Design a protein with these regions (language model features):
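Alpha-helical transmembrane segments and their membrane-interface junctions
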Residues: 348-363, 425-446, 517-524, 570-576
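Short aromatic-rich membrane-water interface segments that cap or initiate transmembrane helices
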Residues: 57-73, 180-187, 367-380, 449-456
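Transmembrane helix-loop-helix hairpins at membrane boundaries of multipass inner-membrane proteins
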Residues: 1-98, 172-173, 177-178, 494-497
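Alpha-helical transmembrane segments and their helix-start/interface "positive-inside/aromatic belt" motifs
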Residues: 24-35, 144-151, 333-341, 411-423, ...
Length: 578
């Protein structure tokens, strides 16, 4: 393996392993400089680079495949790993350092995989390592949110795994587009599995539940990888699947509306992950070269400005210990650098001209107009208004500009966090002013796109003005307040809690009615468990002169179905009690 085909994901995983074992004095330079090696490896990868590994039964693992699409996602993932490493290098938690780098490396593993088995391996590694970024906070809320996160990703991972098994059993080992059909069982299983990772509404509640409970540094990584890896997979596998258009529009509006009602900083930002990923999913559904480039560009931009928003929120929580917006105020004077970085990130996510969100979001909206989806164009613009209202206006005013609530800066923010925030803010402005730095690497051929036309700029200013006027008119009513907002997880957590309670009462009633008979049934069932086929068969072959191991052998489908049934029941149970 030479530098020209060195897998950058392996480098990041190695950085994580080193950070796990070295003393704290060496961990800081490892986290700060290690990801730069991965970034260098990405820059040396040329389109067409491939690397394989022989596997069992003549199967070959294509663990490294580089084309224009995988390269640009690998680039931004390594850039984010480097920024996140700088932001987190003051952290003394070696497990968190290991999981964050391995998580980023696994995201690269999925991105550069060309076969289904490699993809599912790194996808599951992503789920496992991201879980510990939530649990590393070590609070009851993070532990419970982590369990719910685990159960949802077990469910989604098993759907994806089942679909991949169907593809592999049919001899389809390589990751190929599925949108053109057939829309068979494998298609739907893989689509559902990826949709859970993409937080497609109504399968999104795990994200808003878990990401705010991560550590200050861990949430920065969480906001950057899982959903964007899912977007990459959707572009690669399901481009042009038209029903995704409307799911994307629903996500964009749903996330923006719920964000307006939120009082918790990181929950609000998490809802906007759902909203912004909706733009990408809609672009995937449109399926044109322009729309797919828009989805790719917006994923690139989103990672930069969303991570910057989470870094700023993390700095506020680190300094003050406060997460609720209504408990903050007057921080512009107390944390001026954080304030200006937040302003840049807020203007970027709102799609204000000269910031990177504008040069990417406008491509998807223009693609919808070009494809004659006028309603999609309008609804996505309305979602942009909601974004500007809840982040650029609500968060900036009530956190930084509102009268001081007596917030005390309990500890100084480490300099490395400021450095990472400064890098993120610089990139948001740089790509916004010079969009060709991004456009030249977009993977699909399309007509030259110029974002800074009079029409685009005027339309953007008009839409943002629509949000500013009502905010100023109804400022007292826009003040955040503590309230319970029910999300889609209520529909499975509340009913299943009743089901679990009812089943518990039923089991107790049956146990009391049976009395000693219950013990007899238990003993018989234990005897039966040693040879369940003896119960299913009318008469075993007792007189057979020779032992035949095939007598009681059942199809492999039976234990698989039993296992999946147990997993599903366990999922329902734990969702109800957690």
């Amino acid at each position: 393996m030479t530098m020209s085909n060195l897998h950058p994901g392996f480098i990041l995983i190695a950085v994580g392993l080193i950070a796990l074992f070295v003393p704290k004095s060496l961990r800081r330079p490892v986290l700060a400089a290690g990801p730069l090696l991965g970034l260098g490896a990405v820059l040396t990868l040329a389109p067409g680079t491939n690397a394989t590994l022989p596997f069992i039964n003549g199967i070959t693992l294509h663990y490294l495949h580089v084309d224009a699409l995988s390269w640009i996602f690998a680039l931004i993932f390594c850039m984010m790993a480097a920024i996140g490493g700088i932001y987190a290098c003051h952290n003394s938690n070696r497990m968190e350092a290991f999981c964050s780098m391995t998580y980023a490396g696994s995201a690269l593993g999925v991105t550069l995989a060309q076969d289904w088995l490699t993809l599912i391996f790194f996808s599951e590694l992503m789920a496992a390592t991201s879980l510990f970024l939530i649990w590393c906070k070590k609070t009851p809320a993070s532990r419970q949110a982590g369990y719910r996160y685990l159960l949802m990703h077990m469910f989604g991972g098993n759907l994806l795994l089942a679909g991949i098994f169907l593809k592999v059993s049919a001899g389809d080992y390589l990751v190929m587009p599925l949108a053109q059909g057939p829309w068979d069982t494998a298609f739907w299983l893989i689509c559902l599995g990826i949709s859970i990772n993409a937080a497609v509404v109504p399968l999104h509640a795990w994200l808003v539940d878990a990401y705010p409970e991560g550590t200050v540094t861990g949430s920065v990584f969480l906001s950057s990888f899982t959903t964007k890896v899912a977007v990459y997979c959707l572009i690669r596998i399901f481009a042009g699947t038209d029903f995704l258009i409307w799911f994307g529009v629903l996500m964009a509006l749903y996330g923006a509306c719920y964000a307006i009602m939120e009082n918790d900083m990181r929950r609000l930002l998490s809802y906007h992950i759902v909203s912004q990923v909706g733009f990408m999913v809609a672009g995937v559904g449109l399926g044109t070269a322009m729309a797919l480039n828009g989805a790719t560009a917006h994923a690139f931009s989103h990672i930069l400005y969303k991570s910057l928003l989470f870094m700023c929120a993390g700095a506020i929580i680190y300094a003050t210990g406060i997460r609720k917006i209504n408990q903050l105020g007057g921080l512009a004077k107390k944390m001026p650098f954080t304030f200006w970085c937040f302003v840049i990130a807020a203007l970027s996510i709102s799609g204000v001209p000269l910031f990177n969100g504008f040069i990417s979001k406008s491509i998807t909206i223009s693609a919808a107009a070009a494809a004659h989806y006028g309603s999609v164009e309008l609804l996505l613009q309305l979602a942009g208004v909601g974004t500007f209202l809840s982040i650029a206006l609500k968060m900036i005013y009530f956190i930084f500009l509102a009268p001081d609530n007596g917030v005390v800066i309990k500890r100084e923010v480490p300099k490395n966090m400021y450095v990472a925030m400064g890098i993120g803010a610089t990139l948001c402005v740089l790509y916004g002013v010079y969009p060709e730095l991004l456009y030249r690497y977009l993977p699909f051929t399309m007509e030259p796109y110029h974002p800074f036309t009079v029409d685009h700029i005027t339309q953007s200013i008009e839409m943002l003005g629509m949000a500013m006027l009502p905010f100023m008119m109804y400022l007292p009513k826009m003040a955040p307040h503590t309230a319970l907002s029910l999300d889609t997880d209520w529909f499975y957590r509340k009913p299943f809690a009743g089901i679990v309670t009812g089943l518990s009462y039923l089991c107790c009633a049956v146990s009391r009615a049976l009395g000693n008979t219950w013990e007899v049934l238990y003993e018989k069932s234990m005897e039966l468990s040693h040879n369940p086929m003896e119960f299913l068969d009318a008469k075993p072959l007792r007189n057979s002169s020779k032992y035949n191991p095939e007598n009681y052998r059942t199809s492999i489908a039976d234990p698989i179905m039993i296992t999946l049934t147990i997993l599903f029941c366990s999922l329902c149970y734990f969702m109800a009690i957690i």
